[in-house]
């Protein structure tokens, strides 16, 4: 990825690495992980590509399946040039990505110690549309409410919003989940609290761990250590892990268990008395459902996280991004890459960022 006229901040990680990246995994400080610059770049690109593929794949199913899953006999469109078609005709589909990139842009312009208000003002005054917790936070920021994401002022605080835009935190902290969580502590509370914030912390940690492990079970379980054990979010994801072990060949049985135990939407006004469930934990569970039952298979992961329903573009986006980091851009199957091609040299609307890979001569900070 690169920008027009400036270098993207995630690429700066590669410069500072001096050809290799060394990570001391913070929860196992005796373990050191080293990778080459080219491997790191491949994984970063894989994360952004997987995220974009996922949100595009689930585009026409989002919230059409509430309290039910998409049957196996129902096909989901995917074809050559599909992402470019969607970027041209439906740019607001990519709200999770343009929020992600807004935060990346602030970090590039202001630095890693950028104050909280720089992130808040950036998305509150942006031209793009927002929904739920993000939109409520935008309203609060514009009207001077400082705790813009707190449940007392934002009825969507437990919604999925930060969870779907926390990818950058893990992508910019390879192998360092605690550092990813520190960024999430600063930014995630602008629009979410409680489960909504925990979801972003968890997703960011999974992205971070995907740089240093090819074991999906490890990534899912280790990332959960960033979440308080007494929280309902922790309990929900822990149950998914338990049910996966109990029903290792039947993701639909685990889906039914989730529906029975965690399908209540008690925060978002749009879902309290309706089948809609945009709560972070149930949708995070569908991310994990795809990752565990997909077990490293990109197609299975996409299919399951999408077919689980509810926010079925954002969930495969998160799952695809995490798996894209683990596998690397070069290992994403051709079936999925055909849909992405043509969009790689196209800017995301509302941003100056695109997917084109930096050439060796771009590797400078001048």
Locations of regions flagged by a protein language model:
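Bacterial N-terminal signal peptides that target proteins for export
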Residues: 2-9
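Bacterial N-terminal signal peptides
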Residues: 11-19
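C-terminal motif of bacterial Sec signal peptides marking the signal peptidase cleavage site
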Residues: 22-23
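Active-site cavity-forming subdomains of large catalytic enzyme subunits
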Residues: 41, 49, 99, 104-201, ...
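Active-site-surrounding "flap" and adjacent substrate/cofactor-binding loops of secreted or lumenal enzymes
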Residues: 60-90, 97
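Accessory "access/gating" subregions that flank catalytic or transport cores
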Residues: 150-157, 171, 176, 189, ...
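Catalytic phosphate/nucleotide-handling subdomain of diverse soluble enzymes
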Residues: 291-354
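Conserved small/polar residues in nucleotide/adenosyl-binding loops
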Residues: 355-360
